[in-house]
From Swiss-Prot:
EC number: 3.1.1.29
Cellular localization per UniProt: Cytoplasm
Gene name in the database record: pth
Protein species of origin: Alkalilimnicola ehrlichii (strain ATCC BAA-1101 / DSM 17681 / MLHE-1)
Residues at which tRNA binds: 21, 72, 74, 120
Function statement: Hydrolyzes ribosome-free peptidyl-tRNAs (with 1 or more amino acids incorporated), which drop off the ribosome during protein synthesis, or as a result of ribosome stalling.
UniProt keyword terms in alphabetical order: Cytoplasm, Hydrolase, RNA-binding, tRNA-binding
Annotated GO MF terms: peptidyl-tRNA hydrolase activity; tRNA binding
Tagged with keyword Disulfide bond: no
UniProt protein name: Peptidyl-tRNA hydrolase
């Protein structure tokens, strides 16, 4: 994390569109967008030129855009890249929210910059931003199946009730921190989220 991160202007929740994938671990980014809209109102509307549904979030004195790509996960850059380019968004002002198999259910970690860590959605966004890796990430833990051969069916399935509750609790806590992220107060958000057990 840098000492003075940019205020977030765009929150991108990653997932796969369609009822088949609703509630799956891979759609953890969508879970956050749903929680923010439930709390603060608004509705996502299709924007075909960006291959995404978009909404504006008003939170205190701050506002930002919410994006739910309507591409499949592996093509998330088709939504994020053109939007960031058109509005000239610095990568540091973009928060990408995604599932993280290397964290247990119930944990959330914030990170600024870095590689894709094998996550195909992040890989495609990095490619679409011209190999720019400086965008921010909120990594929502969904747990690991125990062996790499089981990762794809695991993330594309729905969690057991106890895991679902842990992930939902983490999403709610991340939603509590969004106003700080919009203000650029990463230290406060990290202190709260990274102290979760």
């Amino acid at each position: 994390m840098t000492d003075s991160p940019q205020p977030i202007q765009l929150i991108v929740g990653l997932g796969n569109p369609g009822d088949r994938y609703a509630g799956t671990r891979h759609n953890a980014g969508f879970w956050l967008l749903d929680e923010l809209l439930r709390r603060h109102g608004g509705a996502l509307r299709p924007e075909r030129r960006y291959h995404a549904d978009l909404a504006t979030l008003h939170l205190g004195p701050h506002q930002c855009r919410l994006m739910r790509p309507q591409t499949y996960m592996n093509r998330s850059g088709q939504a994020v890249g053109p939007y960031a380019q058109f509005f000239r968004l610095p990568p540091e002002s973009i928060l990408v929210v995604h599932d993280e198999i290397d964290l247990p259910p119930g944990q959330v970690k914030l990170k600024q910059g870095g590689g894709h860590g094998g996550h195909n959605g992040l890989r495609d966004i990095i490619r679409a931003l011209g190999n720019e890796r400086g965008f921010c990430r909120a990594r929502i833990g969904v747990g690991h199946p125990g062996h790499r051969d089981g990762v794809v069916p695991y993330v594309l399935s729905r969690p057991a009730p106890d895991e679902r509750r842990a992930i939902a609790d983490a999403v709610e806590e991340l939603a509590d921190c969004v106003e700080w992220l919009l203000a650029g107060d990463w230290g406060r958000a990290c202190q709260r989220l990274h102290s979760r057990s």
